[in-house]
Amino acid sequence: MSNINYAPTIWSRADALKVNENDPTTTQPLVSPDFPVMSDTVFIWDTMPLRELDGTVVSVNGWSVIVTLTADRHPDDPQYVGANGRYDIKRDWEDRHGRARMCYWYSRTGKDWIFGGRVMAEGVSPTTREWAGTPVLLNDKGDIDLYYTCVTPGAAIAKVRGRIVTSDKGVELKDFTEVKTLFEADGKYYQTEAQNSTWNFRDPSPFIDPNDGKLYMVFEGNVAGERGTHTVGAAELGPVPPGHEETGGARFQVGCIGLAVAKDLSGDEWEILPPLVTAVGVNDQTERPHYVFQDGKYYLFTISHKFTYADGVTGPDGVYGFVGEHLFGPYRPMNASGLVLGNPPAQPFQTYSHCVMPNGLVTSFIDSVPTSGEDYRIGGTEAPTVRILLEGDRSFVQEVYDYGYIPAMKNVVLS
């Protein structure tokens, strides 16, 4: 279907050694432990603003819409009540992934979100878990394609089409009833469950390439191959300093940012392409990849964790980025290391699952914030929005806004 040739960009161990967790220009400001919670009845985490295929965050008839991974809170469930008779919110929070559902929220102000409910009714999605993706407004009729990940059994990139209906009182997402599976990991470019039982394959983010006008999608994957068989060679090492040639068990970390191209703009048929960026020997997770197109450059962002780094390299939970002049690369790690926005060392788990929007605003959710002593407070709610400035290959943290502030860049009036 396509005749596309390119070599993946390698995020090397030498690049990762440049990560500086104490650089104030790439550190997310501290989140206060007295943060507000947007709901007492549900946890939210990965947040997906409604957008168009060029990345523009949109409102519809004046209503902003976000989709979130959502799970009920269980304060009265006996399995989450500790020996002291109190609600064990930590365990409830840690169990959320197995019951993740796509839910939506709406707002007139780009904050103060009102809960709308499930996007898909129970039983519509073919798997037990609904994991992250991207909601795309297709036209001024209100049609929406929700790209997402069907997980357990297996993991597949899928989409479901529905529509948005608005009134003076609120928003309804309707008719999301038929899920179309698009593709799964192929074993040639992307690791399968058979090759590695803890494989990663998820988080579709479709976009129109501003240069060729075609519909593509980035997603999280792992480089294909049986677990433990990958080689951390000279290219994966990069120009490391003396004493850093030993890689330990780094061959087990094989994250990558994947790419696929659609047959046409309907997005119903896709061809899997080689990864754009590989992190063999550096990191095992490159979650929720997405683009910002600015100043003739392709800014490719992803999120990752400290605990998924390979032996001998480390970095904070947060946003990592790569920049290039062409979709197919080559890319350069932003700020020389790849780190764009990391949690502060004093609060290493305060936020995660950042989404960088074309206006420079970055949304994320609150995970856990230290309170006193060894105690901490679980979030499961929107974090303060921050703004970053992109200048060439560099980025700078600029401002902090309200919790969950996700303003529309454009309002679409339905015909």
UniProtKB/Swiss-Prot annotation:
GO BP annotations, alphabetical order:
carbohydrate utilization
Indicate the residues that form the catalytic site. 46, 287
Q: Is the keyword Cytoplasm assigned to this protein?
A: no
Indicate the annotated site residue(s) for Transition state stabilizer: 203
Q: Where are the transmembrane segments?
A: none
The UniProt disruption phenotype note reads:
Disruption mutant does not exhibit a levan-deficient phenotype. The lscA-lscB and lscA-lscC double mutants also do not exhibit a levan-deficient phenotype. Insertion of an antibiotic resistance cassette in the recombinant lscA gene abolishes levan synthesis when expressed in E.coli.
Q: Where in the cell is it found?
A: Periplasm
* Single annotated GO MF: levansucrase activity
Question: Which residues does the annotation say bind sucrose?
Answer: 45-46, 132, 202-203
Q: Which UniProt keywords apply?
A: Carbohydrate metabolism, Glycosyltransferase, Periplasm, Transferase
Q: What is its EC number?
A: 2.4.1.10
Record's GO cellular component terms? periplasmic space
If you read the UniProt record, what top EC class would you report for this enzyme, in one word?
transferase
Extra info from the record? Strain PG4180 contains three levansucrase-encoding genes: lscA, lscB and lscC. Of the three copies, only lscB and lscC have been shown to be expressed while no expression was observed for lscA under the tested growth conditions.
The protein's job, in short, is:
Catalyzes the synthesis of levan, a fructose polymer, by transferring the fructosyl moiety from sucrose to a growing acceptor molecule. LscA encodes a functional enzyme in vitro, when expressed in E.coli under control of the vector-based lactose promoter (Plac), and it can restore levan production to the lscB-lscC double mutant. However, lscA is not expressed in P.savastanoi pv. glycinea PG4180 under standard conditions. It could be an ancestral Lsc variant in P.syringae.
Name-wise, this protein is: Levansucrase LscA
**Species annotation:** Pseudomonas savastanoi pv. glycinea (Pseudomonas syringae pv. glycinea)
